[in-house]
Swiss-Prot record:
Protein name per Swiss-Prot or TrEMBL: Calpain-13
Residue span(s) of domain EF-hand: 537-572, 635-668
GO cellular component, one term: cytoplasm
Classification of source organism: Eukaryota, Metazoa, Chordata, Craniata, Vertebrata
Domain of life: Eukaryota
Keywords, sorted A to Z: Hydrolase, Protease, Repeat, Thiol protease
Family label: Belongs to the peptidase C2 family.
One Gene Ontology term from the biological process aspect of the record: proteolysis
Native source species: Rattus norvegicus
Domain Calpain catalytic stretches: 34-331
Single annotated GO MF: calcium ion binding
Biological role: Probable non-lysosomal thiol-protease.
Zinc-finger as UniProt keyword: no
Length: 668
């Protein structure tokens, strides 16, 4: 019986099938050969029977990109984007929708794609990384792709057959799972987890919260992966319906907004179809009456009438036509009323767990995991997430081999540290939750549990199963002020006598002496800022703050730079709380008073025209400013004013070369 795990270490990378990319590449380069992958051969077995039935096998060929491209092939051309992807014959929209979402987080995407090309050290070999049961697995492939004639069997390159990263990544994922057939009709959360190592929150759209728009918008802005699926229609196969949607199909959620329409406001959500075409034909779709009746800068910001698979639709239509929404992030997102996306969670992780094949029924209760719930809380406070190794499963196996129960442990049994005795599992004992069958490779279950000690008991149907178990425990917000919409805690007031701001800062340092933008985002949202969805610091805002405060121009903040930022955050909080019209809301008309009340802006000159432009830049469509937007505005105003004074010789004008100007405006 396990009671806890060690602190989460940096996950090592495992070589799939023991293939070392650098060794294989260097050997091919030294021999002047292009790599041929014998572990995933250019044969029908790599396609799989499910996709070969009735297909023209004699005409199937495997060709390298240089034999298919209309020009020099590229791995990535002008940046990786969801619009580079176009689904082929395999029903792998579940994987491609997840991949499309990942392209919106370039930092995470780069960890999977890595730096590769068709020019530097090209040897016909590529490698990609996927997350499998608590560890990253590196998959090596050759670049031979299945075609009939010169038509791609699976994912198509979009730009003149020149950009090949989606095709090669799809092949690597097919190799990981066994064949291209294993990509044919899968489970969307599996791909979300395999691409990130995150945990998936499933939202039933028929009973979703009223603030779904804000939840989705915040999730997209903070780099979480968001995707959704349509239900089955009349047939078992996916088909295009009259409204333009595809049944049994996965879509990427790429944005959510509120837009002024006629005399009111309309909530709209943006989706992308992995087919690369075939869009919604209803309200707010491309070319719809709603867009014709919408004018101004807001329309130009949001709307493009392109046949690229991306479209807007109203949230009401989204609820009616989609069955479920999935949000994948490093920690769970609960949908309880009043809960913010920056809830604090503690994770217990149990890797490489194996249930032997001879455990079943009552005898299967020898895999046990203890955890404690410390304090009472509203809403779901425990998340149990199982990830089963694909090799433990057979195609379309049912019943699924793994099941689990959660029991509360009485005080008289808490002395047992290694194993609860059979007497604990008497026929009169009720589980905190009935038997849960792990029906998918990635299965997540939420619980609302009272304080006490609990045990997760896993068992199998007489089969050996390898899995990862993660238990997420919600931590109390001891420093939250229940009477305020947000609370940026001044560090000096919350630290003990023996603790300094620098030691608090140490908790967020990545084994060095500074932090990057993503760590800054975590620090601001999880430690200092609590508020409604949408009022948290986005990654883009943190990158902007980072550039403004980064005196050394290295993309990170050191101790002194962070201390400088901290003092401004605390001052911004005081100004915001003093001037706000209502809790958590500042009107753009209050900006003059804000600037006059901000000490670190002393001496800054501002015209009414410039202030009007800043109002357009930093306020929302209803003229309100969130606290993060205000921070970005004030810090940028200070930085640019100081830059002018430092560069000006007469206090009236400055002279810059083109490169000096570009550096100033592009990285600040």
């Amino acid at each position: 019986m396990a009671h806890d795990t060690e602190a989460l270490e940096e996950t090592s990378v495992v070589k799939f099938k023991n293939q070392d990319f650098r060794f294989l590449r260097d050997r091919c380069l030294s021999r002047g050969q292009l790599f041929i992958d014998d572990t995933f051969p250019a044969e029908a077995s790599s396609i799989g029977q499910k996709l070969l039935m009735g297909k023209r096998l004699p005409k199937l060929e495997w060709k390298r990109p240089q034999d298919l491209s209309f020009g020099p092939p590229h791995f990535i051309l002008e940046g990786a984007s969801r619009f580079d992807i176009q689904q082929g014959r395999a029903g792998d929209c579940w994987f491609l929708a997840a991949l499309g979402s990942l392209t919106q987080n370039p930092q995470c995407l780069q960890k999977i794609l890595m730096n590769q090309s068709f020019s530097y050290q090209y040897a016909g070999i590529f490698h990609f990384r996927f997350w499998q049961c608590g560890q990253w697995v590196e998959v090596v492939i050759d670049d031979r792709l299945p075609v009939v004639g010169n038509n791609f069997c699976f994912v198509h390159p979009r730009r003149g057959n020149q950009e090949f990263w989606p095709c090669l990544m799809e092949k690597a994922y097919a190799k990981l799972l066994g064949s291209y057939s294993q990509l044919h009709y899968g489970y969307l959360p599996d791909a979300l987890v395999d691409l990130t190592g995150g945990v998936v929150t499933r939202i039933n759209l028929h009973s979703s919260p009223s603030d779904l728009l804000m939840v989705v918008k915040t999730a997209v802005q903070t780099g979480s992966m968001v995707a959704c699926a349509t239900p089955k229609w009349l047939t078992e196969e996916s088909e295009v319906m009259e409204n333009g949607l595809v049944s049994q199909h996965a879509y990427t959620v790429t944005g959510a907004e509120k837009i002024q329409y006629r005399r009111g406001w309309e909530e709209i959500i943006r989706l992308w179809n992995p087919w690369g075409n075939t869009e919604w034909r209803g309200r707010w779709g491309d070319g719809s009456q709603e867009w014709w009746e919408t004018h101004g800068s807001r329309k130009s910001q949001l709307y493009e009438n392109k046949d690229d698979g991306e479209f807007w639709m109203s949230c009401r239509d989204f609820h009616e036509n989609f069955s479920c929404l999935y949000i994948c992030s490093q920690f769970p997102i609960t949908m309880d009323p009043g809960v913010t996306p920056n809830e604090s969670w503690r994770q217990m992780r149990f890797k490489n767990q194996v249930i032997s094949g001879n455990t079943a029924g009552g005898d299967g209760r020898d895999i046990q995991y203890l955890f404690d719930v410390q304090e009472p809380m509203d809403g779901n406070n425990v998340i149990v997430a199982f990830t089963v190794m694909p090799q433990s499963l057979k195609t379309e196996e049912w019943p699924f081999p793994l099941q689990f129960q959660v029991f509360k442990v009485d005080s008289q049994f808490q002395k047992f540290q290694k194993r609860l005795p059979p007497a604990f599992f008497s026929q009169f004992r009720d589980a905190a939750q009935g038997i849960d069958y792990v029906t998918k490779r990635n299965f997540t279950k939420s619980f609302h549990l009272s304080p006490g000690t609990y045990v997760v008991v896993a068992s199998a149907h007489g089969k050996e199963v390898e899995f990862l178990l993660r238990i997420f425990l919600k931590m109390p917000h001891k420093d939250r002020n229940p009477n305020s919409s947000f609370n940026l805690k001044a560090l000096k007031g919350s630290l003990s006598e023996n603790e300094s701001p620098k030691s608090s800062f140490h908790r967020y340092m990545d084994q060095g002496l500074d932090i990057d933008a993503s760590q800054l985002q975590s620090l601001l949202n999880q430690e200092y800022l609590t508020g409604p969805p949408g009022d948290t610091f986005s990654l883009d805002q943190c990158q902007s703050i980072m550039a403004l405060m980064d005196l050394k121009v290295n993309g990170r903040l050191d101790r002194e730079e962070f201390a400088r930022l901290q003092s401004r955050l605390i001052h911004c909080q005081h100004v915001f709380q003093h001037i706000q019209r209502s809790q958590g809301v500042l009107r753009s008309s209050d900006l003059w008073e804000v600037i006059e009340s901000t000490d670190f802006l002393s001496g800054v000159l501002l015209s009414k025209e410039l202030l009007s432009l800043m109002t357009l830049r930093y306020s929302d469509s209803s003229g309100r400013l969130s606290f993060p937007s205000l921070v970005c505005f004030l810090i940028r105003l200070e930085t640019m004013s100081k830059a002018f004074r430092n560069l000006s010789k007469d206090g009236k004008s400055i002279y810059l070369t083109e490169m000096e100007w570009m550096k100033l405006v592009m990285y600040s």
